[in-house]
């Protein structure tokens, strides 16, 4: 069976942070590298993308769940995009009536950034999402989630195994049901766990969830493992470890920077 792995390049939410007190779980923002055989797929392009390799066996694809800054921070400094002749496919959730390139140009263009991504030396090709599509041998399925401005939940299936990436989510009843359908029997569910229960109650409408809500979804959909992501920027390693220990489930973990997980 071919390799199907997830490497955590960045799991921090909202903004990048630094310091020894946050080193174990990492300070880089959302970016995950999935290796499915010879196909590489990145989930989001946050600041963690800066540490990604730039040479691959086939054309890599970067899937952006949404265009909030913490999820696209790394694109402008990703070395591969500046290497002439290297192709990178970038999938962007554009608003209705807007093409995918224009959506990114709102940030990656003067005066906010010196170049548009399409002006880099590399061969950067920008595409819109489809609700179901194939990238190499990987089946990609998406659905709109619940987050201010929108955010896609993304399912990757490869050789009979699947992972579901559902960052930045605060689902109501209807959206929760559709997420449960998307993640049914997934081998790995990656879900927003930024808030504590108390914070989730105080910050309704912010578009994030607590671990208890993620666990409830895991149990509802029958996912085998849960990886909690999008850590609050102020949360320290000690606080995250304490939360993980309080949960006390072997199949539930908070994402750790640099970790590689076999799907």
Where are these regions (language model features)?
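Binuclear metal-dependent hydrolase catalytic cores
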Residues: 1-164, 174, 179-180, 240-263
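Glycine- and other small-residue-rich loops at beta-strand/loop junctions that grip anionic moieties
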Residues: 93, 143, 168, 203, ...
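Cap/insert and terminal regions of metallo-dependent hydrolase folds
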Residues: 171-258
